[in-house]
Design a protein with these regions (language model features):
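Sec-dependent signal peptide cleavage junction
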Residues: 19-38
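Active-site-adjacent "subsite" loops/lids of carbohydrate-active enzymes
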Residues: 50-81, 150, 155-217
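The substrate-binding groove and active-site-proximal loops of carbohydrate-active enzymes
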Residues: 65-77, 115-131, 190-205, 254-265, ...
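Short, acidic/polar
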Residues: 72-91, 203-214, 296-312, 332, ...
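Catalytic domains of carbohydrate-active enzymes, especially glycoside hydrolases
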Residues: 81-108, 217-222, 312-316, 383-390
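Aromatic-lined substrate-binding rim segments of carbohydrate-active enzymes
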Residues: 86-87, 103-153, 254-280
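Polysaccharide-binding and catalytic clefts of secreted carbohydrate-active enzymes
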Residues: 177-310, 322-323
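Substrate-binding cleft of secreted/luminal carbohydrate-active enzymes
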Residues: 311-331, 338-417
Length: 417
């Protein structure tokens, strides 16, 4: 091994020694990558989950907005009625998997020792709803022979002032308001948004501990991360933390660039999450739904090519291909092929995320979604021809919606086959 490389990587290994994992050093999008060490010994399972096994996944995302009360009625009964409706409507459209938000804002849809109760449940973050929503949602989903994946935003705490008020026990307030100044940068601000800072081993451990809570205590079929990694490619966002890393190095060490350092931080989080899940229950799947453009993903420190080719990161990838065949920047067919080519590990499933919310609307992609009423149908057919393992639709609220009714009707002709 090259001596310069050793000098470069050893300090980073020391920096993140709290969490063992796979570290990928990648200065450019397509440069050769070096791995140390990867979870090659982790047992991989061939079955999918609750009822799908090796069949086609037909999933729908259930975002926090779909779970939230529309009339400020925060009773246990009203929540259960909303979720019952979600399950019943999904069954009508041949959905066999629900991807349900359980941690949208550094919060929790169950009683957690780490994260406060979600504001979705009572209107106020931190308030106990008096029942276990996650337990109910899983039991209801399984009773209809559907799979349940717990959807987690790993870093997001607040987005555009949602939720409006963070609980005192929210990690942001806890770390910013205590007497310990050394943890102030464990959370970061960007405009009206707040995020956990994944460069610190302590922060990554807390995120992973939150996943452990779910997998240990609930019979989920999967854990699902979406595309929220580093929220910006602006290097000022975490410059002070990067400077801390630089100051920790010996004079002879060759530092990682800030881009390389960010990628290593995220890879440590992802591989650590995967390892933790498998150590508890090897049948629970771990998947990520990155944005469509791989180059943009890499700018946000998502090391797609490593995740898609090596053991120890994910069980599935579901790129959010919310684009149609006429998209002038990246067409659907081109994106499908790019991802098909990227996912070279036969142990990793390839699902395609479809932007159902765009169907029948003239608001997106220069109005090209109004050019036909069978775009989703053709996307399913093209995806199947490419060898994908299933589809995830965004989002549930557009399954039974006047805007998308014709598209859904045509898509069902092929999804039911």
């Amino acid at each position: 091994m090259d001596k310069k490389f050793i000098k470069k990587i050893v300090p980073l290994l020391l920096c993140i020694s709290l969490l063992s994992g796979t570290i990928i050093v990648s200065a450019k999008n397509n440069v050769e990558k070096t791995t140390i060490p990867e979870y090659s010994k982790t047992k991989l399972t061939s079955n999918y989950d609750y009822n799908i096994k090796d069949g086609e996944v037909k999933a729908v995302w259930v975002p926090f907005m779909s779970l939230e009360s529309k009339d400020n009625c925060y009773t246990e009964e009203s929540f259960k009625q909303r979720f019952d409706n979600i399950v019943e409507e999904s069954k009508k459209y041949s959905i066999n998997t629900l991807i349900v938000h359980v941690r949208p804002f550094g919060d929790s849809m169950y009683k957690s020792d780490i994260f406060p109760w979600s504001h979705i449940l009572t209107g106020t973050q931190g308030n106990d709803p008096g029942f276990d929503p996650l337990e109910y949602m899983i039991n209801k989903t399984h009773s209809e022979n559907m799979s349940f994946h717990a959807w987690v935003n790993p870093l997001r705490i607040q987005s555009n002032n949602t939720p409006g008020i963070l609980a005192d026990c929210n990690l942001y307030n806890k770390w910013r308001n205590d007497s310990d100044k050394s943890n102030d940068r464990w959370v970061l601000d960007l405009n009206n948004n707040k995020f956990l800072n994944p460069c610190y081993p302590e922060v990554r451990k807390i995120i992973i501990d939150g996943i452990r809570e779910i997998v240990e205590n609930y019979p989920v079929d999967g854990i699902h991360f979406d595309d929220y990694f580093y929220p910006t490619d602006n290097m000022d966002f975490d410059k002070e933390s990067y400077n801390e890393y630089l100051s920790s190095l010996s004079q002879t060490a060759i530092p990682l660039s800030q881009e390389e350092w960010r990628i290593a931080n995220i890879n440590s989080l992802i591989s650590g999450t995967y390892s933790e899940i498998k150590s508890i229950n090897s049948n629970v799947q771990f998947g990520i739904s990155p944005q469509a453009n791989i180059n943009n993903d890499i700018k946000m420190s998502a090391d797609i090519y490593s995740w898609a080719s090596k053991n120890g990161y994910v069980d599935y990838l579901c790129p959010q291909l919310y684009i149609n065949f006429d998209n002038p920047i990246l067409s659907y067919d081109k994106a499908v092929k790019q991802w098909r080519d990227a996912i070279t590990n036969p142990n990793i499933k390839y699902y395609i995320g479809l932007g159902l919310y765009k169907a029948g609307s003239d608001k997106y992609d220069d109005g090209t979604w109004k050019s036909a009423d069978n775009i989703i149908q053709k996307q399913v057919e093209y995806g199947r021809d490419s060898g994908c393992n299933g589809f995830m639709l965004y989002s549930w609220e557009f399954l039974n919606n006047s805007q998308t009714s014709e598209e859904i009707s045509n898509a069902m002709k092929v999804l039911n086959n």
